[in-house]
């Protein structure tokens, strides 16, 4: 899989946190955690990586989608099925993340643009930007 070269002006940091994170879609609770890892990457919204144990496994289905990132590694995706409707690629994860973000191994990241994210009891706006308005049209590397 081809991945674009690193940009010397992009920085990626991963920090453990105790913030309370809830992930919902269409009123359904998908995940809830008090031990996320926050990933900050230049030009992108903060990503909340949640321990796999904190994501409801009964809603997840493996996806064939894979993407690459020159800063984090190669991502695999999981779709979410709610009331018979399949939502593609709502979570991604790195089986072998690069050294800079090695602590996200065993964690899943919700696609902020396509879910409802509540952090410390406060609903977060769905970001617009490089991944599309409100994240609905199309997908790009995680």
Where are these regions (language model features)?
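Terminal leader/tail segments of proteins
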Residues: 1-142
């Amino acid at each position: 899989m081809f991945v674009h070269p690193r940009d010397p002006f992009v920085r990626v940091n991963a920090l453990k946190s105790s913030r309370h994170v809830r992930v919902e879609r269409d009123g359904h609770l998908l995940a809830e955690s008090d031990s996320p890892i926050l990933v900050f990457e230049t030009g992108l919204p903060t990503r909340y990586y949640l321990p796999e144990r904190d994501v409801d496994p009964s809603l997840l289905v493996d996806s064939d989608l894979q993407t690459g990132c020159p800063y984090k590694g190669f991502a695999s995706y999981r779709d979410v099925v709610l009331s018979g409707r399949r939502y593609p690629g709502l979570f991604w994860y790195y089986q072998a993340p690069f050294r800079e973000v090695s602590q996200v191994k065993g964690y899943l990241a919700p696609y902020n643009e396509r879910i409802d994210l509540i952090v410390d009891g406060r609903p977060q706006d769905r970001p617009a930007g490089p991944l599309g308005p409100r994240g609905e049209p199309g997908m790009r590397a995680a």
